[in-house]
């Protein structure tokens, strides 16, 4: 059974460096990721995931919706909004688009 790796607690210095790098480039080359990992004493996957998460967070904060998502929402087939509505009995449905 595979155990999940514990959550990485980045230091303030590591976060500051990652944020500075992100402000210059939203995407890293493999070479840049390798250098950053060595510089910050992290492994490359930690750097990669941090950048992926940061891009996703920015995309979500921008409020820009994907065109396909808008079409599916109009058809009532898609709603991934994080509203605070509580439904005690939620049912799952699978839709196949032909």
UniProtKB/Swiss-Prot annotation:
PROSITE patterns: ENGRAILED, HOMEOBOX_1, HOMEOBOX_2
DNA-binding region(s), chain positions: 3-62
Region Disordered, annotated ranges: 79-98
Compartment annotation: Nucleus
Chaperone in keyword set: no
GO CC annotations, alphabetized: nucleus
PANTHER family reported for this sequence: HOMEOBOX PROTEIN ENGRAILED, HOMEOBOX PROTEIN INVECTED
Classification via SMART domains: HOX (SM00389)
Annotated keywords: Developmental protein, DNA-binding, Homeobox, Nucleus, Segmentation polarity protein
Superkingdom of the source species: Eukaryota
Entry's family note: Belongs to the engrailed homeobox family.
GO annotation (BP), single: segment polarity determination
Biological classification of the source: Eukaryota, Metazoa, Spiralia, Lophotrochozoa, Annelida
Name of the protein in its database record: Homeobox protein Ht-En
């Amino acid at each position: 059974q595979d155990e999940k790796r514990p959550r990485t607690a980045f230091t303030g210095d590591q976060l500051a460096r990652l944020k500075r790098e992100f402000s210059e480039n939203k995407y890293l080359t493999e070479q840049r990721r390798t250098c950053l990992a060595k510089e910050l004493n992290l492994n490359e996957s930690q750097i990669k995931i941090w950048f992926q998460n940061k891009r996703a967070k920015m995309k979500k904060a921008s409020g820009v919706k994907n065109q396909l998502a808008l079409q599916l929402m109009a058809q009532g087939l898609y709603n991934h909004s994080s509203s605070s509505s509580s439904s005690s009995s939620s049912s799952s449905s699978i839709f196949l688009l032909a």
